[in-house]
Structure formats: C-alpha cells, structure tokens
C-alpha cells in the first residue's frame, strides 16, 4: 500500500510571522478607508501599508503626520494596531480565547511560549493574564499622569492625547498626534523642557522595554535582586548601562546651547528613546555626527526579549560582550552572576547580530544608491526601521515607493525577530552525525 503523506501543520514560529503579516494587511485596508483620513479621502495603499506596518511593528516611522492627516477613527485604528503589536499578535489571540471561555490548547500554549520567549509551557496562561493586567494597569496610570499636561494645553481633547501617548510610549511605538496642518512631524519637541512629561514618558518606555518576563521576576521576588533569574539581572544591568553611558556622551557632544538642567533632561530622554521608542524632544538633524553615530548603535541594540520593543535585544549585546571578555581572559565558558551561558545561546546571539547588521547595511546602502542621498542619512533610517525605533532625520516622507518597501521589510523583520524568522523558514532537524574537525585561523 502506498505510504500516506503526513499532514503538515504550521509551526509556532510560522504562525507568529503570518499573524503579524495578517494584522498588518488588515490595518492597511482599514487605513485606506475615507473615514480614516481627516480629509475623508482614500489613502493610497502604499502609504496605508507603511503606516500599518510601522504601527504593528511599534516603530513610529511615518509618511503622513499622524496628528493632522488621520481622523479620530484613523488614529484609533493606529492605536489598536500599536497595542496589538506591542503585546504581540499571539498574546492578543490567546487573550481573546481566554475571554471567550474556550480552553487553550497545548499547541496554543507552545506558540505563546515561543512568542514571548518563556522558559517553559507550564504557567503560560497565568503569565498571559499577568501580562495583560500589567499592561493595562501601567498604561492607565501613565494616561492619568499625562492628563495634567495635555488637558492644560488641549482641554477635553487632552484625555485622548493622554491615552494615545501613554500606550504609544509603553509599547515603544513613538507615534504622536501633536502635529497640525501648519506644524507637522513635531513629536514631543514642544515639551522638551517639561520635566513631568519627560519623566512619565521615559518611565513608560523603560517599563515596556525591559520585557514581560522581567516584570514577572520583579513582581515575584520584589527588590531581592539576588533571587532574580540571570536573564533578568542581565537585562536590568544592561538597560541601566545603555541609558546612562550614552546620556553622558549626548551631554558632552550635543545640546550645548541650553541650560545645564535642560541639557541633562534632553540627554537622558534621547538616550532612553533612541534604543526603542522613537519620540524626540530635540532637533535630531542638528545633532553632531558623533551623536548620530551613537544613536545608530543604540537603535540596532533595541530593547529586551519578550518586551514591546524590537532590535537585536539587550541580552544579545550582553552575551556577545561577555563571551568576548571570556575569550580575552582565556576562559572556557562565558557567563554572568555565577552562571554560564549555553553554547547554543552564544551561537544564537552571533547569528542575530549578524542578521541585523546585514539587514541594516543592505537596506541603508540600497536606499542611498536608489535615492541619491548620503549614506549616513540612509543608514540612520535603516537602523531606525530594523531596530523598530522610528527616529528620522526627515527623509522618510519623501522616499520613493521602492525605498519605503525596503523600510517596510526592515520594520517587519525587526519586530518578528531574527530567530523567529530563521526557525520559521528553516526546518530544525536533530542529527547525531558530525563532520570531521579541522582548525581554521581567524583574526
């Protein structure tokens, strides 16, 4: 009898990348509707697709000013896409299943585990509920804290402003609705000296960017740092370093024309927002080349695993640096806090870093050649896209369709993650066979 072919099922990684793609397409179709634009016109598909991708991938790059071009309905669609992208498509889907009272299957639990990089399947439903409660609680508190600022400036409309910017900040999206027909793409530049708003936005960005698993660790163990998992310790320490060290460079190299207090605030805000969020309170095009180069590096590094942020992740950077330090000291194993890294983790980190740098350079160089723009400008936009940051030196709205498509691909790949993409495309096969060993000289 002929052997029957086994029915092939989508892997959890394939479901993740297809889920993101499906939400992006649905968002683009909704944004094309006349009701989505302030002028009640049909938005071209390429512009709607770019905006939807940027929202779902929590990036913040735009070709139309969010505050002046889109209607209230359009802004609500964008905010819903940001929330979906920030939580993750799989998290939202599992949440819908739970709210409907349906039982979560083992396959769905496994997909959720891969989506948020959870260490085990057990307890995944509890963790999902914790993520949802924590997300809405923090976003709600953020909105309340922003009310005094926006209601003072916009009256009753300030309520919507507070909700939108709280969610956008927590999800590390960088979208703002402060632009007007006469003053577009302003971001938070009008609040550069507002201490309260800057602090609230920075805290929302940091909390959203450290990851759901780190929240769970902190919530469970409170301030007992020694009890945290090694990953949580690395994330918190690396995040602190990547906030304060770049802030010192920004303070020294840029913003010299303002007072010490405002200069400190600008430097801190720029350091926090550059890795993940994409808000800006300063004129980025006027920053020094050193400042812009530091920003490119920060954008590529991104946030932390299982967070609302993109990029190659803080843990990837930490693992590579610690492995290099171990090599310099002629140590067999790399690790931190009395624990060593598995060799596969180091391989994964190197693969992710290589993938992001290839995408970054390929995207930037291609746009530069096609548009005839300087390489530094285009590398900046490419880093912003693949790191899902959203900062721009002002060239994105004027790019041709091909260059926009490149940025769309970079944003998408930057959000779904390097390993997710690799595992979705390449089948993983276990084999005990090994090739003969031969040494090769490197360096």
PLM regions: where:
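Membrane-proximal intracellular helices of multi-pass ion channels
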Residues: 1-443
């Amino acid at each position: 009898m002929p052997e029957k072919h086994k029915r092939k099922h989508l892997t959890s990684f394939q479901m993740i990348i297809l889920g993101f793609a499906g939400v992006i397409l649905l968002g683009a179709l909704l944004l094309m509707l006349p009701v989505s634009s302030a002028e009640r016109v049909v938005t071209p598909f390429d512009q709607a697709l770019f905006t939807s991708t940027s929202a779902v991938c929590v990036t913040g790059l735009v070709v139309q000013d969010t505050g002046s071009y889109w209607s209230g309905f359009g802004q609500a669609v964008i905010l819903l896409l940001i929330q979906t992208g920030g939580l993750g498509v799989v998290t939202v889907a599992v949440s819908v299943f739970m709210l409907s009272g349906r039982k979560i299957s083992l396959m769905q639990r496994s997909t959720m585990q891969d989506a948020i990089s959870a260490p085990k399947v057990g307890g995944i439903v509890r963790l999902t509920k914790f993520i949802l409660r924590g997300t809405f609680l923090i976003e709600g508190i953020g909105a309340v804290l922003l009310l005094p600022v926006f209601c003072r400036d916009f009256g009753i409309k300030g309520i919507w402003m507070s909700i939108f910017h709280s969610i956008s900040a927590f999800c590390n999206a960088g979208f703002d609705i402060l632009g007007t027909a006469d003053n577009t793409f302003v971001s938070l530049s009008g609040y550069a000296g507002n201490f309260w708003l800057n602090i609230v936005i920075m805290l929302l960005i940091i909390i959203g960017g450290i990851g759901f698993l780190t929240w769970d660790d902190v919530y469970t163990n409170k301030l007992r740092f020694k009890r945290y998992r090694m990953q949580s310790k690395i994330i918190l320490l690396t995040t602190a370093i990547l906030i304060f060290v770049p802030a010192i460079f920004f303070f020294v190299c840029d913003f010299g024309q303002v007072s010490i207090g405002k200069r400190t605030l600008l430097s801190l805000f720029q350091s926090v927002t550059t890795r993940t969020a994409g808000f800006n309170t300063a004129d980025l095009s006027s920053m020094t080349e050193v400042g812009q180069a530091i920003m490119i590096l920060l954008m590529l590094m991104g946030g932390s695993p299982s967070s609302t942020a993109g990029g190659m992740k803080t843990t990837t950077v930490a693992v590579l640096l610690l492995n290099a330090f171990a090599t310099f000291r002629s140590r067999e194993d790399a690790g931190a806090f009395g624990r060593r890294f598995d060799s596969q983790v180091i391989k994964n980190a190197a693969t992710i870093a290589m993938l992001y740098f290839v995408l970054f350079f390929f995207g930037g160089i291609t746009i530069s050649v096609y548009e005839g723009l300087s390489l530094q400008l285009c590398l900046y936009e490419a880093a912003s896209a693949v790191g899902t940051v959203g900062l721009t030196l002002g060239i994105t709205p004027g790019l041709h369709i091909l260059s926009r498509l490149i940025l769309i691909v970079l944003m998408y790949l930057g959000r779904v993650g390097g390993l997710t993409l690799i595992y979705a495309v390449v089948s993983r096969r276990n084999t005990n066979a090994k090739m003969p060993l031969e040494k090769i000289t490197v360096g």
